[in-house]
Amino acid sequence: MPRIVLLHDAADAAGRPDSSDTLLEAQAIATALATLGYETATLPVGLDLAALKRSLRDIAPHAVFNLVESIEGQGRLLNLVPTLLESLGVPFTGCSAHAVATTSHKLVAKKLLRQAEIATPAVLGQPGDGPWIVKSVFEHASLGLDDTSVVKEPAAAARILEARRAEFGGDWFAERYVPGRELNVAIIASPTGPRVLPVAELKFEGYPEDKPAIISYAAKWDVDSFEYRHTVRSFDVEPELAARAERLALACWDLFALDGYARVDYRVDASGCLFVLEVNANPCLSPDAGFAAALERSGIGYGDAIGWLIEDARRRAHARAA
């Protein structure tokens, strides 16, 4: 029976819900792989990459399912895992080390988007006025995002940047906050090529006018919060806007040389202009996450999608070796 190794973040000692979710994601995928006839083994990934290398050589897996979103809480190290897997010649799901590196550094990604003439919010210090939103350069899962992240003046943004560095460490930046709607588009490598899944909108229902309409940390992870209960996913996006979002997602897929699966996040301003916020080369595949919801909406079974990703990993590894 072919064996698949699932790599995931080592458990966070602080028990953050975004870290714990990676374990649930791995369990769901292992269950899906078992129904497809695969044996599975799961390995937590820390900074001891030599130990990981030995384990992978001992197991000699049919393929690796790479679910690592950070290494010991550091998103800046995200590309180390695909780099190791590429050096070993092991088939693995998801994007290449280069694609992960260029998309996980949000400022590098924004530079490449601008060079390709794809709209993305201006960074503080570039021409343009606020308001501004403060974000982590490397971390995902909306870490550090709350109502105080959105400010009107550069001086206020500077204070929040300093506060976030003190609280979370790492690098932070401020970009122009785009009032409006929030969309995302998931793409999966199907047997016939990249397939765009239905465009999703995250609606901020019942938000007070003075409350920033953002996907905050609470909106993603705190099930008892106002933000979580009032941020609702919908697939009823008007066809013209959805078509533009789909085309732009495919342009990002090509620009960053993405593989396997990915997600592009947008804001839509009052004039209907789409701004790319982030290109996520390793989005969450938990059954209750947006990617799985988009699969269901498109009529693709969760297990079928997991199987596609293994097949894609094997196909790409064979092409690299040829």
Please tell me what each predicted stretch does.
Residues I4, F65, I133, A186-A189, ...:
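A short beta-strand motif that forms the metal-chelation/ATP-contact edge
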Residues M1-P91, A97-H98, T103-S104, V108, ...:
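ATP-binding N-terminal substructure of ATP-dependent carboxylate-amine bond-forming enzymes
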Residues M1-D9, L56-D58, V100-R181, S190-T192:
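Active-site nucleotide/adenylate-binding loops and adjacent lid/helix of ATP-dependent enzymes
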Residues T40, A63, P91-F92, T120, ...:
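Hydrophobic beta-strand scaffold residues
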Residues P154-R247, A270-F275:
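Phosphate-binding site of ATP-dependent enzymes
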Residues V81, D236-A322:
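ATP-dependent carboxylate activation and anion-phosphoryl transfer catalytic cores
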Residues A32-T35, E139-A141, K220-R229:
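Short, basic/glycine-rich phosphate-binding loops at helix/coil junctions
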